[in-house]
Amino acid sequence: MISSLNPLFTTHRSGVIAQQFFASSAAASINSVSSLKIAACSKTKLVDQSPLRQSGNHQLLSSDFNHLQSLKNDYAEEKYKSRCEVLKEQVKMMLDQEMDVVNQLELIDDLQRLGLSYHFGDEITSVLSGIYNRKSMNKMRNQWGLYATCLEFRLLRQHGFDVSQEIFDCFKDEKGDFRPSLCEDSKGMLYLYEASYLESENEESNLEMARRFAAKTLKKNLDEKRVDQDLVALVQHALELPLHWRMMRLEARWFIDIYEERSNRNPILLELAKLDFNIVQAAHQNDLTYTLRWWRSTCLAEKLTFARDMMVENFFWTVGIISDPQRGNGRRILTKVVALITAIDDIYDCYGTLDELEVFTTAVERWDVNSIDQLPDCMKICFLALYNFVNEMAYDALKEQGVNIIPYLRKSWADLCKAYLQEAKWFFSGEVPTLQQYLNNAWISISAPAFLVHAYFCVDYPINKDHLQYLDNYHKIIRCSAMILRLTNDLGTSPESEVLNVGDVPKSIRCYMKETGACEEKAREHLRFLITEAWKQMEEAQTLDSPFSSTFNGIAVNLARMGLCMYQHGDGHGHQNSEPRDRILSLLFEPICCLA
C-alpha cells in the first residue's frame, strides 16, 4: 500500500493534466474477460462437477508464427553498424567542443528526443555537470528568457541534479503570478509546460501553478492561431500527453519526422537517428523471434485456449521499458515474465473456479508441485511453466553470481496470485470494496511489483545484496510505478458500461462512485489527480530515496510510461484499436526510409 496516497477523498484542485489525457476513455472497449465470468462457479467443487468454462473475447494483433520467424532486416548488417559508429564519433566531437550553453542544452534535448542519448551518457553527464556547477549561471539566466531557463531546468532535473523551482521566480510579478506578457511567447510556454511535470512531492505549488498557466495559455494561443506553424505539432503533442510521461522509444519515432522538417536540423543527427532506429529495430526483431520460439515451446497457447496469445504485444511492453539494444537478454526474460503474467491473469479472470484458484494460489505460495494434483491439466501446465522459468532464472543467478534469488521471485509471484485471488473473491461475492481497499490490493494485482523484481535481477549486475530488502518490501519507487500503471489501466479499461454492470470485477472508478456518490467524470478526475500525485512521489523517490541504480530507476519510470502509452486510447493490451496497432507496427516492423 502507498500510505501517502491515503487521503483519497481530500478536496483538491486537480490542476491541468494533459488536455486530451484519457479524453476518449469513456468510449473505450471494456475488458470483456470479467464480464464472461459466471457467478455460479463460486459454488463449484473440484470433483464430481464439470464447471462451464469461458473463453476470452480478445481482439489482438495477429501473431503469425511462421511469418514472424522469417523476418529479415537488412539493418542487422555490419555496414550499417560501421556507418553508425562514424556518426557517433562526430556527435561526440559536437558534445566536446566549446559552444554556447543554450546550444549545448538544445543539442542534449535533441539527442534525447531522437532516441540517441543512450550512446552518449558520459558526455551528456559531463556537459550538464559543467552547466550545473558554473557559478555564473544565475547571471546568464537573467539574460536567457523563459525558454532557455525551462530547458535547463527540465534537463538538469531529468538527470538527477538538485534544481530549485525558484528558478522561475524572475518571471513572476509582485503578486507571485507569472507575468501576462509571457503569454506572447508560445515557445517559452511550451517549455514551461513540459518542465512543470518534473515536480517532486512536498514541493510548493509553483510548478503546478506553472502547469495551469502554461496549459491555459497554449490552448488559447492554439485556438486563436497565435502559435508559430513550426510549433503547432509540438504544442498539440504536449497537451495530449507531456513529454516526461511518454514512452521514449515511441517518442523518438514521432520526433524523427518532426526534426526532419526543421529548418535548423543537423544532418548528422538526423542520419544517425534514422540509422540507429533501424539498427535497434533489427535487434528487437531478433529478440522477438527468440521469445516467440520460447512461447511455442511452452505449449501454453495450445493448452490455455481461453487465454490471450499475444507475444507481439507482450514484447512491445518490454521494448517500451528497456529498449537499449545491448539489453537483449533482459528484454527476453522480461517478455517471458509478461507472457506468464498474462496467462495467469486469464486463469484467474475467465477460467478457474474459486476453489481451483485457491489451490493454485497455495501452490505458488508453497512453491510446491505436489499441491497441483487436483487442478485441471491446463492450470497444472501453467504452474509448471512458471515453476520452471523461475527456477531456471534463479539457477543462472546462483551459478553466475552466487546469490539465491528464488525467495524474492517466489514472493513476487505469490503476492500477485494472492491479489488476483482477492479480486476473484470480490467478483464471486459481488462485493464492491472501498477505493482504499481496492487500491491496497490493485497496485499489486496490476503485476508491476512482480515485473520489477524480475527486472532488477536482469539489469543490476552484480546483484547488490544490500538492495534485496528494499526489493522484497517493494520500495517506494516500485509502489509508485505500480500505482500509476494501475490507475491508467483503470481509466483506459473502465467505460460507462463497466460502472453499470454489477457482476463485473470492480475497478477504482466504480469503487469511488459507490463510496462517494460521485458521477463518473468526477471519479475519473480524481484518478487523474492520483496519477499526478504518484508521479510527484516517484520523482522524489528516484532522486532522493532510491537505493537502486539509475538503470533500474529508469525501468520503473518507463513501466509507468507504458501504462500511459497502452491505456491512453482505451485498452491497448487486451482490446486493440488502430492506435496501439499502428504504434506496434511502427516500432517493431516498419524501418525508417534512409536515403543513400
Swiss-Prot record:
It catalyses: (2E)-geranyl diphosphate = beta-myrcene + diphosphate; (2E)-geranyl diphosphate + H2O = linalool + diphosphate; (2E)-geranyl diphosphate = (Z)-beta-ocimene + diphosphate; (2E)-geranyl diphosphate = (E)-beta-ocimene + diphosphate. Mg(2+) 2 binds at D345, D349. It is found in: Plastid, Chloroplast. Residues 1-39 form a transit peptide. Its cofactor is Mg(2+); Mn(2+). Pathway: Secondary metabolite biosynthesis; terpenoid biosynthesis. One of its GO terms (molecular function) is myrcene synthase activity. Mg(2+) 1 binds at D345, D349. (2E)-geranyl diphosphate binds at R308, D345, D349, R486, N489. The keyword Hydrolase does not apply. A motif (DDXXD motif) lies at residues 345-349. It is an enzyme of class 4 (lyase). CDD domains: Terpene_cyclase_plant_C1 (cd00684). The Asp-Asp-Xaa-Xaa-Asp/Glu (DDXXD/E) motif is important for the catalytic activity, presumably through binding to Mg(2+). Monoterpene synthase (mono-TPS) involved in the biosynthesis of monoterpenes natural products, constituent of coffee beverage aroma. Catalyzes the conversion of (2E)-geranyl diphosphate (GPP) into linalool and beta-myrcene, and, as minor products, cis-ocimene and trans-ocimene. Not able to use geranylgeranyl pyrophosphate (GGPP) and farnesyl pyrophosphate (FPP) as substrates. Monomer. This is Linalool synthase TPS3, chloroplastic. The gene is TPS3.
